């Protein structure tokens, strides 16, 4: 071996020692029961793209919107915990039967603005993280729904107009509140809503203007009452074993992606309601923005027991969250 060969071999050896090992490419399928055009879908697209770019292509996330992967939101929590799904974007009120803490953002009339919804999320985030941790999961970010109202085939502006209306709610909180107020409310997954509207199984829906716009509710309904019931959260969570298998750089990339998605989702609230209302009215929906205070009072009173029932289930943590939130809002 001559001196050139010796130096070349030595240089190659040094380069191999100095070069970091390339991270193995991770391919994840990400479930989401809602449409790609929703706030949650658009934030998820940002999340997947940023994760890919920040990881140098070593994190490859394929989004499955509209429940197309075969899981509804109510099934996501257990599926991610068990590893059947590596990651999901989930409407958390629908899994409150498993972990009651997740009902928090759906409590009736607790928040009245985007800033209050953000404050509640900031206060409660450590508690959410703890719940995910004890269920073999990592919480990555939350995306908010705009305020929920009642979509129906008529103006819902009083107890009389609500009485007997078959209204879908997404969780136990909404179901209880509407039933107490006189509606024939039932809890139903999002994927089942449009088929039930089409068949006459329901004739009203408690959801945001955003949700109904994305699902083109004007094909079945005529009115939206902006009662501002709640601003519930979707959360993106990943199986802890899958997360732990990532390299340090990949986990950092995932954190960067989660922040980008969070910024996208919360930032969209500033203009989304006005955009939704304009599209709804262009498609023939009567938007009732000034809902009578008497009706709002009825709904608020009807939802009072939801708070006491929730606090019985979550105990001191719930009291601490509500106290901190009310002190900061």
Describe every region a protein language model picked out.
Residues 1-2:
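N-terminal secretory signal peptides that target proteins for export/translocation
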Residues 5-8, 24-116, 124-125, 131-329:
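N-terminal secretory/targeting leader peptides
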Residues 10-11, 21:
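Cleavable N-terminal signal peptides
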Residues 12-16:
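Hydrophobic alpha-helical targeting segments used for export or membrane insertion
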Residues 17-23:
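Sec/Tat signal peptide C-region and signal peptidase I cleavage site
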